[in-house]
Each structure stands twice: as C-alpha cells, then as structure tokens.
C-alpha cells in the first residue's frame, strides 16, 4: 500500500519495453492480508490495494502507463494455476511460498474449485 509499490510497478512496465498505454495488472497480497479471520477475502484490504496501485504516476521525461484495471490475488496461489487446471476438483495442491518477509501455505482444490486451508506466518521470510 506504499508509494514504493506503485513506483515499482510502473518501473517494471517501463523496463518491459512496451509502449506506455492503458494496462490491466494482477498483483498479490500475503495470505494474512488477503483473507480475514474467517478465511474469506478481506475486501477492505483488497480494495485498498487496488486503490493504491491505480494511483497515477507522472514521469519527467515521457509518457506514463495508465492502470485501467487491477486484479488482486492471494500470494502463492497464482504459482499453482497450471497444475490446478490439470487436476480434478477432488484433488488438491499444497502451495508453499517462502517469500522475503512471509511464509504462505495454501491447500487449493483442483480446477481452483476452492481454497480449503491457508496459513501465513508474517515473521518468517528470507530477507535479512
């Protein structure tokens, strides 16, 4: 939800080499921020993330990208999209994401039929 986050997204877009234009982006939130205590999407956090990412950025020497749409996903889940698409809804995949500042674990049903369990430790990560 920070200025640095917005600038990092626009920097990545500029470095991609595509011409500045309207774009749709997909971003993530740690499981502990994406889900509430009842394991339901925390719409306040999701909407806050969307609003942050959609803030305009101006460049001194050039045209900027315009974020047209933002989709917010729980961290780690997108890593399993391909495998989950090939599984039946009766199978499940355990996805473990050891990130810079969090450890996210999710048990997801095949075909993305549901997320049956999530765990996040916001104190475990690989950043020093």
Identify the residue ranges that each predicted region occupies.
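Nucleotide/phosphate-binding catalytic cleft detector across ATP-hydrolyzing
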Residues: 1-95, 112-124
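A short acidic Gly-Thr/Ser loop motif
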Residues: 95-103, 108-110, 124-126
């Amino acid at each position: 939800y920070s200025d640095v986050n917005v600038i990092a997204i626009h920097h990545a877009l500029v470095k991609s080499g595509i011409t500045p234009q309207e774009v749709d982006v997909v971003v993530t939130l740690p499981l502990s921020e994406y889900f509430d205590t009842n394991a339901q999407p925390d719409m306040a956090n999701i909407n806050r993330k969307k609003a942050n990412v959609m803030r305009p950025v101006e460049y001194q020497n050039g045209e900027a990208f315009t974020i047209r749409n933002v989709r917010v996903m729980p961290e780690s889940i997108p890593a399993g999209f391909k495998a989950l698409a090939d599984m039946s809804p009766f199978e499940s995949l355990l996805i473990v994401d050891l990130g810079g500042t969090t450890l996210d674990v999710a048990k997801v049903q095949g075909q993305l039929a549901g997320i049956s369990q999530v765990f996040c430790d916001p104190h475990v990560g690989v950043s020093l």
